[in-house]
Design a protein with these regions (language model features):
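A short, structured loop/turn motif at beta-sheet edges
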Residues: 72-75, 99-105
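Short beta-strand segments that buttress and anchor functional surface loops
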Residues: 81-87, 111
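N-terminal signal peptide c-region/cleavage motif recognized by signal peptidases
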Residues: 17-18, 22
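Bacterial N-terminal signal peptides that target proteins for export
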Residues: 1-9
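Catalytic Cys-His active-site segments of thiol-dependent hydrolases/isopeptidases
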Residues: 108-115
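N-terminal secretory signal peptides
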Residues: 23-83, 152-155
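Short, surface-exposed coil-to-beta transition loops
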Residues: 90-97
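C-terminal partner/receptor-binding element of secreted or periplasmic proteins
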Residues: 24-41, 116-155
Length: 155
């Protein structure tokens, strides 16, 4: 009886840990992903492998990420989506919107660059260049753009 009690307690603890980990999936920041699971690293490496002239902060997902990633659904598939900036100070001019599938098999991103020093009265939307990574389809491009538009300073 004592052994079965220990087994039950161990099973409950392991199950509880799994639930906490699952609930914590949406609590990540983009700059924490590659160190959190090898699957993220492998998938992201495939995305950036054939891309030319990407900045190191994009290749390594090592920029500033003040916002937590959020869950989003595209075409029935669930993703973690969030922003990453080169630095907190350059976020208005250099940012990356990233989407990883929950199974960590697929990743997409949109690199957004606005000329530095753009006057405040100029719309960043009209002066930005957009570069998609990971060959996102039209629906995924829309999802990445929607995430960018959540920023109140993006107009």
């Amino acid at each position: 009886m004592h052994t079965s009690f220990r087994t039950l307690v161990a099973a409950l603890l392991m199950g509880g840990s799994a639930m906490v980990m699952a609930a914590n999936d949406g609590q990540s920041r983009v700059n924490e992903l590659l160190s959190s699971a090898p699957e993220y690293r492998t998938t992201w490496a495939k995305v950036v492998k054939k891309e030319e002239r990407l900045p190191d902060w994009v290749i390594n997902l090592s920029g500033a990420s003040e916002q937590q990633m959020t869950a989003a659904t595209e075409d029935g598939d669930k993703y973690l989506v969030g922003p990453l900036c080169e630095t907190a100070d350059t976020c208005k001019s250099k940012r990356l919107i990233v989407a990883f599938s929950l199974d960590k098999e697929d990743a997409y991103a949109m690199l957004v660059e606005v000329p530095a020093g753009l006057p405040a009265d100029k719309s960043p939307t009209r002066h930005a260049t957009y570069r998609y990574l990971g060959k996102p389809d039209e629906g995924m491009q829309k999802l990445l753009n929607e995430e960018l538009r959540k920023d109140p300073n993006w107009y």
